Each structure stands twice: as C-alpha cells, then as structure tokens.
C-alpha cells in the first residue's frame, strides 16, 4: 500500500475516534447493528429501553379517550407516547436523528 493511502486510512480512523465521534452518529442514518452500537455508546451503563408495542399504546389511548383526558389538550405523557408510537427506527433509520433523540431512549439511572 502506498504511504499516502496508509496515512489517509489512519487519518480517517482518527477522525472517527476523535471527540466528535458521537456527533458523527447524529449526521447519518442509523439502522440495525449501527443503531444498537450508537445506543450503547450514548446510554453507557444505564442501557436503553424498548418501547411498548403498538397495541399497548393504542389500548392506552382508548382508555384516555374514554376517561375524557384528551378533551383538555395534550397531556404531559403525550410527547412520550408520540415518541414511542413513532419509534426509534423511524426516527434514526428512516430519518436522521440527533444525539439528544438517541438519549431519549436511554434508561434513567
């Protein structure tokens, strides 16, 4: 391998391992094992959670409607429900997500 190719490879690796490596994740689509790796790096030891399945969320929304909780506008948990229903795959694989959006999926220590 030519010396300049070797140098280019080393520089590319250093750029990925540098202090802005977390920001590199936020500027690309994260799918499959790349998404899982990004979550492990973002959440650290606290780990990350898997949102409830869609049926559980729909049941919760029906219960809220029956109790009249939707009449007063969005409830405090509305954003959380929207995030869970939308899902991390939609946020980070189909679209580009930020570091802060990844942190929303971390367990609270």
UniProtKB/Swiss-Prot annotation:
Its main location: secreted. It is found in: Secreted. Residues 1-24 form the signal peptide. GO terms for cellular component: extracellular space. GO terms for biological process: acute-phase response; alpha-beta T cell activation; fatty acid homeostasis; G protein-coupled receptor signaling pathway; glucose homeostasis; glucose metabolic process; insulin receptor signaling pathway; negative regulation of acute inflammatory response. Keywords: Carbohydrate metabolism, Cleavage on pair of basic residues, Disulfide bond, Glucose metabolism, Hormone, Secreted, Signal. It comes from the Eukaryota. Insulin decreases blood glucose concentration. It increases cell permeability to monosaccharides, amino acids and fatty acids. It accelerates glycolysis, the pentose phosphate cycle, and glycogen synthesis in liver. This is Insulin. It comes from Octodon degus. The gene is INS.
